[in-house]
Every structure is written in structure tokens, then in C-alpha cells.
């Protein structure tokens, strides 16, 4: 007597080595014994399951932006609190390097972690990310027991940033693989509907800017109600909880964990082509990124303090500046990416970076430098303008990578776009660290200046000039391109 087993959809399906959803159909054999009668892939079930999985992965990546960037994007609020409520040994001026050091360490770690977790240690991504979450949380807890300024620098600027980098790199690599442009909705490769990796990155970048919009107010509330020690412990718990949740939601893609072509093919795929380092183009853009990043982190760190000390604004207004600084980045990243990658009027990478750099410099020199006591409107205008144009600078890297890929094709050379992107992030990290180290002597240089009518005449005058000049040099690639073209003509 035959019979059909009643099995749930979850039990009917599993995932094969390629990420394909496979449905098993069970039936009777006429003798009452159950066996597998057919084995088939079901496109509808496969696509539904894959879409659900990608939605959860995108949710996890979006959540991860809070623990990764929340502290660094709101550090200006902590910086202001440290200066106004200083009780630790050492100079409070040193706290100015924490925010830029945190960003620098995070970005500098990306090239190395990307190289390690791309293939060789891909199976250990979630473990590494969990270890990073634990390290970041522990660092913030240890920081709450600080008694000297260097304790803050070591825990918040270095250790916590390393932990955040360990969360960022593995999860971002997996996100890109699940939304690979050449992968079908079913999870395998083929000619089906392509997934939107760029859209996925755009959503997570938008969430990063959303974090930067509300975190300053959250940090302010925690500091005012509990003080920095309890606030750091609360943040450690929030960072750990959201990190673990995001890590659970972002598994490594199955195709990365298998080697269908054998050991030789796996070894070949691990080799990273470095031919692009022989050409001048990469170094031109890398230097430009370093210079632009050196000044980019300074407003994020010092704007709240500047608003309180120089323009005499309230704490709420000072915090609002950071929110206004981060919000425009949601739109700017998409716009600058579109300028260098559209079918109607595509602009070269040098042109787009020059637009971002020049407008950022003008905003700094003409708006920030000319603010005076009580000029909230002008500071808000600077925050929005600088945040838009400088915040969109990293979105120009897609055009930079396209140019390097075209150059590699011209020379018939292989190129790894992911590795180039990691190195560009590393250049950004060098800029962040350099800017943080330079900011302290610049503040000391302006320390003897009396508070004047405009920002240039204040203690922050040298910092304002440095930010403006570094922004200008962030677009020097267009000068190099014009010079090279002129040489060829002559």
C-alpha cells in the first residue's frame, strides 16, 4: 500500500554546493517503504528561498553599520565631552587623534583582511567577525576604566578599530558574493536574472550615513545622563549585540567554500595580480586619496568643539552639525558614482575627483573660515556642503577602478578589482592617521591666537587652512592628466 509522506517545505529543500536550492520528492514504492523517487530543482522555490536569504543578508549588512561606524562617526561628541569634563591624567588635546586614528586603523586593516579572507580563510569569516565583535566590545569596556589619556587612545583608537575592521571585512566580502553581478537569483551562476550588488552596497552605505545622522544625538544623551564611563559600557553592549546579529545573518556563500576545479585551480585563484603597481596611475590616485582623507576627518572630530568654543553655540546645535555633516552622504555617494558610470555623459575619474575636491575646499575656505560668533546658519551650510562633496569622494573610486581596469586591458594584464579597492581604502587610512597626528601641532600653533571675528583668527585657524588645502590636493589627479596630455602634444 503506497503512501505519501507529509513533509514541510523546509524539510523538502536543501542547498547544494553551488548555493542551488534542491527539492527532494518522496513517495511510496508500493511496498510501504519510503524512498527518494525524484530529485529536481524547483525554480520557484529556489528563487523564493534565495530572495529571502539575500534579504536577510542585506538586513544583516545594514545592521552591521551601527557597531562598525557608530562610534567613529560620532566621536566629535565624545571629543567635546572629554575636553569639557577632563579628569584623566595627560593632556586632553591628545584626544583629538582618537577619532582619526580609529578611522585610520580601520581603513588600513581592510587591504590585509580582504586579502586573507577572500579565499584562503573564507571558511573562517564568521568566526573572525565574531572575534572582532568581542574585541571591540572588550575594548570599549576597558576604555571605561581609563585613568590616562593614552588608555583612551589605545582602546578606542586602536583596539576597538581593529575589532570593527574584523567585523567589516568578512561581512562585506560575503555581501558582495551573495549579490554578485554574475549570480542568478538561485544562487548559482548562469544566465538568469542578475543580482544588484551595486544596489546592495548602496543600501549599506545609506545605512552608514543614517547611523552617522542619529548616533551623535544618542552619544550626547548617554554622556549627559551617565557620564563617559557608563556610556562606553552601554555602547559596548549595543555594539556586541548588533554585531552578533549581523554576523549570524551573513553566512559565507557556498561557492566560496568549495573548490570544484581542484587544488591547482584553487591555488591559482588565490594568486593576486600586482601588475597595476608597475604603472603610475594607481599611485596618482592613491596619493590624492591620502591627501584628501587627511583633511576629511578633521571636521568630524573638531566641529562640535569649534561650535561651542568659537561660535558659542549650544550643545544641541553643536551635535546637530555632525548630523547635517553625515546626511548628505546618502545622496552624494550615488550621484558621484553615477557621474563616472552612466551612458549619457560619463566623466573621467580625474574630473569627478576634482569636482569633489574643489567644492570641498571652497566650502572650507569660504564658509568654515568665515564663521563668527553665533553664526549657526553658516556652520550648518558648511557642514551640509562639505559633507556632500567630501562625503562623495570615496564614491569616485569606482571610476578609478574602471580606469585601472582599462589600463590593464590595454597592457593585456590581469587585475583584481577587489584588491585595488582594498588598497584605496588603505590609502584612506593613511590619510586619516596623518591628519590626526598633524591636527595636534596645528592646534598648538593656533593656541596663541586670540579669538577673533572669524574662524581664521581663532585657535582653529591652522586646522581650517589645512583642511582646505588638503581637499584641494585631493583633486590633483586632473592636473597630472592635463600635464601628461600636454607632454604628448609637445
Regions found by a protein language model. Name each.
Residues 197, 204-254:
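Helix-loop-helix hairpin linking two adjacent transmembrane segments in secondary transporters
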Residues 62, 66, 136-140, 149-167, ...:
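Hydrophobic core of transmembrane alpha-helices in multi-pass small-molecule transporters
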Residues 109-123, 332-348, 367, 443:
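Helix-to-loop junctions at the C-terminal end of transmembrane segments
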Residues 108-150:
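Conserved MFS/SLC helix-loop-helix module at the cytosolic interface between two early adjacent transmembrane helices
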Residues 82, 164-187, 200, 392-411:
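Intracellular juxtamembrane helix-capping segments at the cytosolic ends
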Residues 2-70, 255, 267-275:
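Cytosolic juxtamembrane N-terminal segment immediately preceding the first transmembrane helix
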Residues 67, 71-80, 279-338, 345, ...:
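Extracytoplasmic gate region of multi-pass secondary transporters
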Residues 326, 346-400:
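C-terminal transmembrane helical hairpin of 12-TM major facilitator-type secondary transporters
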Amino acid at each position: 500500500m503506497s503512501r505519501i509522506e507529509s513533509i514541510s517545505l523546509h524539510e523538502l529543500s536543501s542547498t547544494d554546493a553551488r548555493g542551488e536550492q534542491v527539492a527532494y520528492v518522496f513517495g511510496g514504492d508500493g511496498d510501504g517503504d519510503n524512498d527518494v523517487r525524484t530529485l529536481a530543482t524547483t525554480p520557484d522555490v529556489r528563487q523564493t528561498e534565495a530572495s529571502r536569504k539575500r534579504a536577510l543578508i542585506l538586513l544583516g549588512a545594514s545592521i552591521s553599520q551601527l557597531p562598525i561606524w557608530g562610534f567613529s562617526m560620532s566621536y566629535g561628541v565624545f571629543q567635546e565631552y572629554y575636553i569639557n569634563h577632563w579628569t584623566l591624567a595627560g593632556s586632553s588635546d591628545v584626544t583629538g587623534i582618537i577619532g582619526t586614528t580609529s578611522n585610520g586603523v580601520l581603513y588600513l586593516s581592510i587591504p590585509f583582511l580582504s586579502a586573507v579572507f577572500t579565499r584562503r580563510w573564507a571558511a573562517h569569516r564568521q568566526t573572525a567577525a565574531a572575534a572582532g565583535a568581542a574585541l571591540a566590545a572588550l575594548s570599549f569596556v576597558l576604555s571605561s576604566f581609563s585613568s590616562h589619556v593614552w588608555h583612551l587612545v589605545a582602546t578606542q583608537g586602536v583596539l576597538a578599530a581593529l575589532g570593527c575592521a574584523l567585523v567589516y571585512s568578512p561581512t562585506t566580502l560575503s555581501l558582495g558574493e551573495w549579490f554578485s553581478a554574475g549570480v542568478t537569483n538561485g544562487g548559482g551562476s548562469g544566465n538568469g536574472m542578475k543580482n544588484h550588488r551595486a544596489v546592495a552596497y548602496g543600501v549599506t552605505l545609506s545605512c552608514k550615513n543614517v547611523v552617522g545622522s542619529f548616533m551623535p544625538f544618542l552619544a550626547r544623551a548617554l554622556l549627559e545622563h551617565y557620564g563617559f564611563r557608563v556610556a562606553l559600557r552601554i555602547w559596548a553592549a549595543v555594539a556586541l549585540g548588533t554585531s552578533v546579529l549581523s554576523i549570524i545573518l551573513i553566512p559565507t556563500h557556498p561557492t566560496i567554500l568549495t573548490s570544484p576545479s581542484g587544488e591547482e585551480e584553487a591555488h591559482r585563484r588565490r594568486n593576486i595580480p600586482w601588475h597595476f603597481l608597475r604603472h603610475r596611475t594607481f599611485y596618482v590616485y592613491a596619493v590624492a586619496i591620502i591627501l584628501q582623507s587627511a583633511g576629511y576627518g578633521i571636521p568630524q572630530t573638531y566641529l562640535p568643539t569649534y561650535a561651542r568654543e568659537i561660535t558659542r553655540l549650544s550643545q544641541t546645535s553643536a551635535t546637530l552639525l555632525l548630523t547635517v555633516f553625515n546626511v548628505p552622504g546618502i545622496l552624494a555617494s550615488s550621484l558621484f558614482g553615477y557621474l563616472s558610470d552612466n551612458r549619457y555623459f560619463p566623466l573621467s575619474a580625474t574630473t569627478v575627483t576634482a569636482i569633489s575636491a574643489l567644492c570641498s575646499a571652497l566650502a572650507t575656505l569660504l564658509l568654515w573660515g568665515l564663521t563668527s560668533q553665533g553664526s549657526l546658519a553658516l556652520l550648518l551650510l558648511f557642514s551640509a556642503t562639505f559633507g556632500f562633496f567630501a562625503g562623495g569622494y570615496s564614491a569616485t573610486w569606482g571610476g578609478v577602478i574602471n580606469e585601472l581596469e582599462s589600463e590593464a586591458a590595454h597592457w593585456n594584464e590581469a587585475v583584481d578589482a577587489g584588491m585595488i579597492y582594498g588598497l584605496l581604502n588603505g590609502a584612506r587610512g593613511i590619510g586619516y592617521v596623518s591628519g590626526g597626528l598633524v591636527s595636534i601641532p596645528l592646534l598648538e600653533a593656533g593656541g596663541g591666537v586670540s579669538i577673533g571675528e572669524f574662524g581664521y583668527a581663532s585657535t582653529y585657524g591652522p586646522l581650517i587652512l589645512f583642511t582646505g588645502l588638503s581637499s584641494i590636493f585631493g583633486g590633483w589627479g586632473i592636473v597630472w592628466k592635463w600635464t601628461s596630455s600636454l607632454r604628448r602634444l609637445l
